[in-house]
Regions:
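Short, charged low-complexity intrinsically disordered segments located at boundaries
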Residues: 15-19, 48-54, 100-101, 149-153
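Short, structured motif recognition centered on aromatic/hydrophobic residues
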Residues: 2, 18-19, 114-124, 133, ...
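Short, low-complexity cationic-aromatic patches
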Residues: 10-16, 26, 30, 106-117, ...
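Short basic/hydrophobic patches in alpha-helices and adjacent helix-turn junctions
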Residues: 123-124, 138-143, 152, 156-159, ...
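Generic hydrophobic, aliphatic-rich segments that mediate packing or membrane embedding
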Residues: 1, 14-18, 34
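Acidic, glycine/proline-rich low-complexity segments that act as flexible tails and inter-domain linkers
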Residues: 3-7, 31-113, 142, 158-159, ...
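Short gly/ser-rich anion-binding loops that grip negatively charged ligand groups
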Residues: 8-9, 21-28, 56
């Protein structure tokens, strides 16, 4: 599938960024084999030398940049999210802001609109993430990936994820569109 993606215009940087984006949503244990596959494809098939051009700025304040990304994607209600809520679980909200959004969403190679579409796919494909899938469908719509576009994305993925998860994804899109 990497060769097909490449032939349809997905660049090596975009391939790597899609895999990196997956880590926060699927976990490194599920993503690592795909990172290896992408690296082998880039080196062995395309003949490029790794590492590719760096897509992040190691000098950025991850927490600050992560919050900026969350606000840009979801709206002002995300300001202060990293320090809000139950003190017993605030560390997870902080990790989400500085790791998921500060480390991944702030990288180059893909914009917010692309990352949100990809994130929505990761969430609905794995199932069991309905609240997050609705939130990210809503973020997609907010960024310009409208309901019709998201339904086309789901339609393209039916062979890979099956009908039950595809129907659940459409339900999430419809709920997000009503909010």
């Amino acid at each position: 599938m990497l060769k097909a993606a490449y032939n349809f215009g997905v660049t090596p940087v975009e391939m790597k960024e899609i895999v990196y984006q997956a880590v926060a949503y699927l976990g490194i244990g599920r993503v690592f084999p795909f990172l290896k596959a992408v690296n082998c494809f880039i080196e062995d098939t395309l003949g490029l030398k790794l590492p590719l051009e760096n897509q992040n700025d190691p000098n950025t304040n991850r927490l600050e940049k992560g919050e900026q990304a969350q606000v840009a994607i979801f709206g002002e209600e995300m300001r202060g999210y990293a320090t809000s809520g139950d003190p017993k679980t605030v560390h997870i909200r902080k990790w989400l802001t500085d790791n998921c959004f500060g480390d991944y969403y702030t990288r180059g190679g893909l914009d917010y609109k692309q990352r949100e579409m990809i994130t929505f796919c990761f969430l609905y494909a794995q199932g069991g993430c309905k609240p997050q899938a609705i939130a990210h469908a809503k973020a997609n719509i907010r960024l310009g990936n409208d309901e019709a576009f998201l339904i086309k994305v789901v339609s393209q993925n039916v062979p890979f994820v099956g009908y039950p998860r595809s129907l659940n994804a459409i339900d999430c899109i419809e709920k997000a569109g009503k909010e």
